[in-house]
């Protein structure tokens, strides 16, 4: 490509389907977030006399943020790190994109250097020890530490990185990708799922990558064997098996566009504590296996409550679009958040569904020892529910101590409501909203770069 080009992918919040999303039987609701990961692909460069490709991925927002890899068709497109700095997510993206497209060295002898700059919006990382710069209409933070040393907020930075880097790297091989992201969205998604699972060393549910590719969605996962059955990267059959998986295999996956109702918005609260998701998941799995059939009954109740929650949001969305007197009364009642809310089933259905979800997670917390909704979070959520304009609130994702999600009327300002209130002293409201769109092309790519 002879032109500079930029792409971005959203973060995520899993609002319904925590733990159940790991099972192919259950659907989940994933909201894409306005916090985005960005990739700027530079025009082709040339390494004269080289029989290898070189990929340079740079992240100027972090100390020592540069990763160099050589890739050769002769060695099965296995990336070889140059200079010692490695990143498993970048490495697996490179391996899979090259293995899928199988570029011929003769066709790229004068354009075998690929340079990509990565940027992340503020909300993904702690802002301590950072300097903020404005690049175009974007606010970017530049950190004094290495990327692995900067605390993350749990919005899906690795899935966003893998998805947007897959898109940017693929644009070197697909001339019309920049202006036709929709055309290649499924290929991008499938390649990113493979790379992300390999980089993590496990076959996750994939909801975070799906949200990065598609935005806000209703999601049911793919069978793990699709990816675990792939041969080793670099093997003689890897490229053909990967291409078959990406292009021809039935993934048996559900990805349906879905979104929060018009007139409502999402607030994400970052709590100054952390949870180890892997340990939580393992504790819940151990509990589930040892408490059958009671655990299956709880999961079934959770699934039904998740469906009622999603269906209730859809009803509110349709209602808001009517703009009639009844709709106005409901949203006025919600703004006051007083006893009049009990008159409207459109409000109580959502709240009752979330109450069931939270009650089930508290039961699992008590029986498994996994702090999905520990008492301190229960108190915080109950306090949030009393705020003006709040429809409902819950623990997103796998739960724990590190985040809350609150759905409110569109024009509500939770920062103003909770300022100087000791009950919310540990909550930092993140500068994010819902984003219905997934990976996409960005305008004015030159505005990302130093002048």
Curated annotation (Swiss-Prot):
ATP binds at residues 150-160. It is found in: Cytoplasm. It holds the Pfam family GHMP_kinases_N. Its main location: cytoplasm. Gene3D superfamilies: 3.30.230.10. GO terms for cellular component: cytoplasm; nucleus; peroxisome; vacuole. It comes from the Eukaryota. The keyword Lipid metabolism applies. GO terms for biological process: ergosterol biosynthetic process; farnesyl diphosphate biosynthetic process, mevalonate pathway; isopentenyl diphosphate biosynthetic process, mevalonate pathway; organic acid phosphorylation. Belongs to the GHMP kinase family. Mevalonate kinase subfamily. This is Phosphomevalonate kinase. It comes from Saccharomyces cerevisiae (strain ATCC 204508 / S288c) (Baker's yeast).
